[in-house]
């Protein structure tokens, strides 16, 4: 199935049902009074995470989703039924933004988690709501309010513990093939990897972690060069990054300069992502003599002013991969188990959150009734005993 990690959709919450004007008319019950019922609220629109989905490709074909409208009120104080909510299934790891304002509505990181993205309209009020001692036969009602309409941007962020980044042909896909059962495409030309790949690394006795491989970065990726930097967002939820460096690049470039390019692109894309824990992994040590490899590694560390973890591996022969994976597992076990989204949900205000507080107040001054007029305020009634 085609991997799609971004989609735009439009959601339309249901309109609220209108209130009803009605009066009780039964034999032997004169002046029965108002009995018009309220309308029903419009249905809301929700996103729900589904662990059985792994792509947003379905949203390329269906882009509009709407909830049901609330039913109108009826006489005999009958309230209209509420509109049915619309629930849209999305993959676990989906982030939802308002496409017009850019605000983050929320992240769906657990199976079954729901997020309201559009609130249904508030129900209209029937004339029974407006009866009072001075307004015994009200002929006013309110209509239901329209449901919210939002343009949404859905972004799928892979849920992985470890993320790999580096230049094309650094050996990231080969590393994943050697430590997990994943089989991403491997070849001797740049950009063999076109979409992110996931692999599960098992160290036995229930100790495992998920590793993500994204397409390689090149200089200017943040400005759109190569495949761009948009795949970097899949690393935002990773807890540690493995910066893979090719000790003997096929194009003859300097490994130290290549490492600086990756760090520069990382900082341009997201300073928060650049501040994540990062380990250096020098790959293809089998292509150089040990002394030559050490010289290159020291030159890279000096250029980066690096004092963090350093690992030497040969992914194709699995040399050094077990040590690296074991250290990764131990590092992850020491971290807190709770997951904190990188970008917290912003405070989202829905259109009709406070409508019910003001709906009646706005109509309190309405004088359209049968029993009262402004002239009545100036009328003086004198009672005399005959």
UniProtKB/Swiss-Prot annotation:
One GO CC term on file: cytoplasm
Keywords (A to Z) from UniProt: Cytoplasm, GTP-binding, Hydrolase, Magnesium, Metal-binding, Nucleotide-binding
Domain Obg residue range list: 1-159
Binding site for Mg(2+): 173, 193
Positions annotated to bind GTP: 166-173, 191-195, 213-216, 283-286, 314-316
GO molecular function: GTP binding; GTPase activity; magnesium ion binding
Domain of life: Bacteria
Record has GTP-binding as a keyword: yes
Essential cofactor(s): Mg(2+)
Keyword Acyltransferase tagged: no
Location relative to the cell: Cytoplasm
Main EC class the enzyme belongs to: hydrolase
Chief place where the protein resides: cytoplasm
GO BP terms, alphabetized: ribosome biogenesis
EC identifiers of the protein: 3.6.5.-
All copies of domain OBG-type G, residue ranges: 160-333
Known function: An essential GTPase which binds GTP, GDP and possibly (p)ppGpp with moderate affinity, with high nucleotide exchange rates and a fairly low GTP hydrolysis rate. Plays a role in control of the cell cycle, stress response, ribosome biogenesis and in those bacteria that undergo differentiation, in morphogenesis control.
Subunit structure and binding partners: Monomer.
Protein family according to the UniProt entry: Belongs to the TRAFAC class OBG-HflX-like GTPase superfamily. OBG GTPase family.
Annotated protein name in UniProt: GTPase Obg
Organism annotation: Psychromonas ingrahamii (strain DSM 17664 / CCUG 51855 / 37)
